[in-house]
Amino acid sequence: MVANAVHHVSLNVSDVPPAIQFYEALGFREFERPDLGFDGAWMTLNGMGELHLLGFPPPDAVGQHFALQVDDIDAALDELTTKGISPTRTGEIEGICRQAFLRDPSGNEVELNQTL
């Protein structure tokens, strides 16, 4: 078996509505989710793959994150700053990419990645 795409990523979030607002600021859009017997939300980014927010406390994890590709990391950070979102750290892997790391309201880490 060979996978051909990422279908979804699931993240535990301690409070679903603030998590929805955070991911909407990153460009995600919420879509209908069936009743699964617990709080949560399903979101998509430009109709390509899904982010499933699960209404459970996040586990303690070091280094666990997912990355979103951006064309211009400076412009992305400027826009997010106007929405009250600031990076926790930034960096560059020389000749490969520029990175900015954000935390959602539950503490999950999200990387913005600009290929060099």
Feature annotation, model-predicted:
Residues 1-18, 64-66:
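N-terminal beta-strand motif that seeds the catalytic metal site of vicinal oxygen chelate
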Residues 12, 32, 54, 112-116:
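Short beta->alpha transition motifs characteristic of CBS
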Residues 2-5, 36-51, 106, 116:
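C-terminal "cap" of GNAT-fold acetyltransferases
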Residues 10-49:
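Core segments of cupin and vicinal oxygen chelate
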